[in-house]
Amino acid sequence: MIRSMTAYARREIKGEWGSATWEMRSVNQRYLETYFRLPEQFRSLEPVVRERIRSRLTRGKVECTLRYEPDVSAQGELILNEKLAKQLVTAANWVKMQSDEGEINPVDILRWPGVMAAQEQDLDAIAAEILAALDGTLDDFIVARETEGQALKALIEQRLEGVTAEVVKVRSHMPEILQWQRERLVAKLEDAQVQLENNRLEQELVLLAQRIDVAEELDRLEAHVKETYNILKKKEAVGRRLDFMMQEFNRESNTLASKSINAEVTNSAIELKVLIEQMREQIQNIE
């Protein structure tokens, strides 16, 4: 299915440990580039997160952010560092004996850094939940890419219909263009009072017809339209293939324009270039 490289997804999970939020956004990029913003507690997850993203995406500049809010009330049982507390009491008593001033305040002792500590949360268990949420965020992210991709596909198919219409238009004008050019050549020869044998005249007319004949270019344009429709139906990433097809379209439209000797064909060649450029702009967004 066609996917856009531009997308956004957000998913939040909550547990007894607190809450975590994943945010993913991406823009156009020739290859896949990943950027991460992870809290210090889960910085070690970066290789795992990168691998999961790379296993499901192929192109785009992807920014992945994790926000973690621990629940302070769920920090666990407070633990007293008895050894440090005793050292502080001993030191405080010594100071008091030296100055004979002040009283030892137990609360001040407890407030001293490192005396009291909350029991650490099980970060491995939390990480497992966070990674499961990442998979869900990736699901949402891909759905967003596919939704936007279907819109891009519709726009491209609309332009392909325009290309087909221009090909039909040019093909319908070719008999009258060839006849007009034949009459024009004969008239020029008569004005110049040049007499050519019938065989020679026919040879000149054949050469002229070959120079201005665009049937081959029209056939190739029709083939490119058909192939582009087939590519749009594929399930894998097709952005690069579509980009290559636009190069082929451009080549044929340039040749068509160079052979044009009629205003109708010239206008169609210009319209083809416009349609091809519009498709190319949309394809820049496709994975």
Curated annotation (Swiss-Prot):
UniProt keyword annotation of Nuclease present: yes
Gene Ontology process terms (BP): RNA catabolic process
EC number: 3.1.26.-
Classification via InterPro entries: YicC-like_C (IPR013551), YicC-like_N (IPR013527), YicC/YloC-like (IPR005229)
Observed effect of gene inactivation: A double yicC-dniD deletion in rich medium makes filamentous cells with little DNA in stationary phase, has no growth defect in minimal medium, does not grow at 45 degrees Celsius. Slight decrease in suppression of RhyB-silencing of a sodB reporter construct.
Cofactor field: a divalent metal cation
Record's GO cellular component terms: cytosol
Annotated keywords: Endonuclease, Hydrolase, Nuclease
GO molecular function: RNA endonuclease activity, producing 5'-phosphomonoesters
Domain of life: Bacteria
Function: Contributes to degradation of small RNA (sRNA) RhyB. Upon overexpression suppresses sRNA-mediated RhyB-silencing of multiple RNA targets but not other sRNA's targets; overexpression leads to loss of RhyB sRNA. Enables degradation of RhyB by 3' to 5' exoribonuclease PNPase (pnp). Endonucleolytically cleaves ssRNA, probably generating a 3'-OH and a 5'-phosphate group.
Subunit comment: Might interact with PNPase (pnp).
Similarity comment text for this entry: Belongs to the YicC/YloC family.
PANTHER family: UPF0701 PROTEIN YICC
Record's protein name: Endoribonuclease YicC
